[in-house]
Amino acid sequence: GLGPRPLRF
């Protein structure tokens, strides 16, 4: 899951 913030890695 991406969690609370969208990770852009």
From Swiss-Prot:
Taxonomically, the superkingdom here is Eukaryota
Picking any one GO biological process from the record gives:
neuropeptide signaling pathway
* GO CC, alphabetical: extracellular region
* Entry-annotated residues carrying Phenylalanine amide: F9
> Where does the record place it?
Secreted
Any idea which UniProt keywords this protein has? Amidation, Neuropeptide, Secreted
Q: Which family does it belong to?
A: Belongs to the FARP (FMRFamide related peptide) family.
Q: What is this protein called?
A: FMRFamide-like neuropeptide AF9
Q: Which organism is it from?
A: Ascaris suum
